[in-house]
């Protein structure tokens, strides 16, 4: 038995989960928020308890030190060296990394180089890796990439219709994201359906504040909605998803909001999507409450959101030539029952239908009617478990 920790480092946060492996038992989990800001918050959950402290945490190294000391303080571990492996979520692996990789040689430098593809994520992911390397230099460190699952896409799916030189020289292509989640729920769907994954055609919908949809055939990603960066694809909480590229030069010419690349990135990544259209919130719970109150902008934002998801599901039904199941996961996908109903009701012609008695808040499993040809599943994602499994597989 060994103890492995899965890490998801953000720019000002550190989410973690400690496992006993290979039993896959969660010993503790937690979240450190507001790193680099005053009154940082560290929360540790274990044995049915939740302990929280407020203190100033200047950087990720200090955050990791507090995390490790908390594990000792609460008698979850006796010493640092009880942890024998750490796995880090990294958003962009580019064409360098087709699978999870042990951190050695120039791996970390390449992760930082790939910040060009995920400027909001990779720098923070790399900071988490460096922090653990500084405090636990001798344990196995593994980087697990959101993009790895999508490296099975055929070239016709990942190439853009741009001059070839932009692919060969600049590596402009579709990379996708949320691959760890799509991979996990596809495997769980096969178990739920009682069929080999290799025999299934699935459409997995990871719908949270960010969102992506993937066509999965025989356990492999064959297409996915996110593109060169996590900005592409469906409409999201604060991101546009797909828009006509000509909008950008137009707004650069005729408004004062698009003067620099940073301006463009800010508007498209942080000020658009549900938030931009509703002028209210990026949170589906707030949107649904505003819709119930008759707010027109919130209603429009919700309708646009559902519409774009339906279109991608329809597109992937064509790519796969049908599907055995549509899977919903992540914050919105797992918890917003009205959203699931509305998405599926608009594509029922394909043979999918939701049973209203099964489609309730907190439900997991098959929510389809008995007669549905395409099953509709709700499966909680567990990216941390996939990370822990990969660490165990790659340990020295």
From Swiss-Prot:
Subcellular location, principal: cytoplasm
EC code: 2.7.2.1
Cofactor field: Mg(2+); Mn(2+)
GO biological process, one term: acetyl-CoA biosynthetic process
Amino-acid positions noted as binding substrate in the UniProt annotation, renumbered to this chain: 89
Active site: 146 (proton donor/acceptor)
Binding site for Mg(2+): 8, 383
InterPro entries: Ac/propionate_kinase, Aliphatic_acid_kin_short-chain, Aliphatic_acid_kinase_CS, ATPase_NBD
Keywords on record: ATP-binding, Cytoplasm, Kinase, Magnesium, Metal-binding, Nucleotide-binding, Transferase
The protein's enzyme class: transferase
Binding site for ATP: 15, 206-210, 283-285, 331-335
UniProt protein name: Acetate kinase
Provenance organism: Streptococcus pneumoniae (strain 70585)
Gene: ackA
